[in-house]
Swiss-Prot record:
One example GO MF annotation: rRNA binding
Any one of the GO CC terms: cytoplasm
Mitochondrion listed as a keyword: no
Entry coiled-coil feature ranges: none
Start and end residues of each stretch annotated as Disordered: 1-32
Keyword Metal-binding appears in the UniProt entry: no
Identification of the protein by name: Small ribosomal subunit protein uS19
Organism placement in taxonomy: Bacteria, Pseudomonadati, Pseudomonadota, Acidithiobacillia, Acidithiobacillales
Family: Belongs to the universal ribosomal protein uS19 family.
Organism: Acidithiobacillus ferrooxidans (strain ATCC 23270 / DSM 14882 / CIP 104768 / NCIMB 8455)
Regions of compositional bias (Basic and acidic residues) in chain numbering: 9-19
Gene Ontology biological-process entries: ribosomal small subunit assembly; translation
Main function: Protein S19 forms a complex with S13 that binds strongly to the 16S ribosomal RNA.
Keyword entries, A-Z: Ribonucleoprotein, Ribosomal protein, RNA-binding, rRNA-binding
Length: 91
């Protein structure tokens, strides 16, 4: 169930402050955050945000197609190495 329109999108305050200061100074440096739960708003477009995936920060370049999604959707937490081949089939 999506969040109520009445409440508006959730953005951590510290991330919102960093985005506002990056826009004011026209900074191109990535914004480092651990807030995977924050919703991407139109203010984020064009910025690079480094989202923590539990081990490292993954750089995410925000475009207009990402608006409305969460930051955590673009920094995957699990790596799939593939299924191990059956040893009996090799013989």
């Amino acid at each position: 169930m999506p969040r109520s329109i009445k409440k508006g999108p959730f953005i951590d305050e510290h991330l919102d402050r960093k985005v506002q200061s990056a826009q004011a100074s026209n900074s191109r440096r990535p914004i480092k955050t651990w807030s995977r739960r924050s919703t991407i708003t139109p203010d984020f477009i064009g910025l690079t945000i480094s989202v923590h995936n539990g081990r490292q920060h993954i750089p995410v370049v925000v475009n207009e197609n990402m608006v409305g999604h969460k930051l955590g959707e673009f920094a995957l937490t699990r790596t799939f190495k593939g299924h191990v081949a059956d040893k009996k089939a090799k013989r």
